[in-house]
Amino acid sequence: LNPAKHMIAVTSETSPLAHNPDYLAAFYMDDYIGGRYSSTSGVGGAVLSLAFGPQVFADFLDGAAAADATAKNKDIRKNPALMDALIGIYERNVQEYPSTAVLPYSQALSRFPAHLQQLDMESNGKQVNRDGNAINYVTGPVIFGEPGTNGQHSFYQLLHQGTNIVPLQFIAFSKNQTGKDVVIEDSTSQVKLCANVVAQIVALACGKKDADPNKTFEGNRPS
């Protein structure tokens, strides 16, 4: 395989690879851009544009810019990122919950929990502040997750009945994200998937008593 015909380089303009004739082309990114932001740089731009076309990447950047603008809003009722951050601080430092589960009910987001895991745990995985002084509070939870309904048959047992309370973040869509919705017994597969989400949220919040202690779950689990 000839790199000059099949491979591109995405690197800093000061890198030895920047003007290397052994590659078909080079795309540049500033050397101060960290990995957690690379999806909106030349790294993400090259991959998304080649795979889906430049307009998709342009739309992606527009969405990122809109999210940035929303994150600057001082009104917490209009700033979901700020609301989520404050809830997370409360759950970790006041309630002392050790972890958070991200549960997308869409196979299209199968890797989204891992993405959030990297963003949150790399960004907050510190023991000193920017001045080098030791931090006297907990910086973040362990983030994990899996698409539903796979997780329901994997680790939801602990979420419902375990002795540790794990805050949950459910993600669901009214429409199928892959365009492959099917009708089964008078309702679509997406409707059934959404019903699973609602049932889990209600069960986690309300719990259920049973004569058999092994089947009892107390509820009062935040999601």
Indicate residue ranges for each PLM-predicted region.
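A SIS-like phosphosugar-recognition module
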Residues: 1-223
